[in-house]
């Protein structure tokens, strides 16, 4: 509810949209990328199409401090990356990558064979290029699959229901109750660590 992620000529950026009418760029929340284009958010990662540099894996577990974990280019084979979509089948996660002049690429990101912690909440991806499909022209986009969610407009009103039926989505004022006090200030927690069983 509080963050928007964008790409521009400088790279991948995070905006604070606690007040959607007054979005603010978060200081220090920019990951420089030379060719940042479309991206996909999945759990604690942002996967960013980064042109000739391949696919950027950005840790967004703390959205106010995103960090580049790695750039993956499959030994130079991914060199015109324009867009990415992530999907899962059984215990494996895949990335469909529009790799421009090279066509459509399929990466196996997580599987029981290559990621021992594949059943965890957000396992560290270990990408492997497993397929290429040549396209008639440059592959510049990948159609977004059915994410089984609802589309809402800027005011929180439902505009579309995808693969399921049920209650309506929350309105803006209802969402704010999850992260704001009645006076408008944000709910916060103290960032503490445990060492030898004691909080520090």
Model-derived features: positions:
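Feature marking well-ordered beta-strand scaffolds used for ligand recognition
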Residues: 1-200
